[in-house]
UniProtKB/Swiss-Prot annotation:
It is found in: Cytoplasm. Its main location: cytoplasm. The gene is smpB. It comes from the Bacteria. GO terms for molecular function: RNA binding. The keyword NAD does not apply. Keywords: Cytoplasm, RNA-binding. PANTHER family: SSRA-BINDING PROTEIN, TMRNA-BINDING COMPONENT OF TRANS-TRANSLATION TAGGING COMPLEX. This is SsrA-binding protein.
Amino acid sequence: MENYCKIVAQNRKAKFNYFIQDKMEAGIVLQGSELKSIRSGKVSIEDSYAAESSNEIFLYNSYIGEYKQANRFNHVPRRVRKLLLHRKEIQKIIGKLSVQGCTLVALSIYFNSKNKVKVELGLAKGKKQYDKRYAIKEQEWKKQQARIMRNKF
């Protein structure tokens, strides 16, 4: 992300469900009504992921709500959207995705300093159930430490 960015949506489950190994930024192909919906905050990327199809990267399962003023020119809320990346970046991603168990997860959607919509993607590997339990224990222990320190002073 650059100097200024306005985060519109975040995938908070991603850091809990996956080990994020690498992060990258990609542009996204949108229709006019989709852009207006994103500006109004009607977007969710909870279960969205990116995958390769015919040497291009597409974003699946992302939700961008309908824009009410667009009437008949409105878009489909859950459609497959093309991501804009350089050819070398796409080849690098395809190489990394060939590793077993790796996936490309959408981490956030934001406006960059030039007011363009960008998607932050994370190359992720799934966590096992015991990894998730360990993460929960760690979070609770940190909260408990903070409470103890607060009561000490």
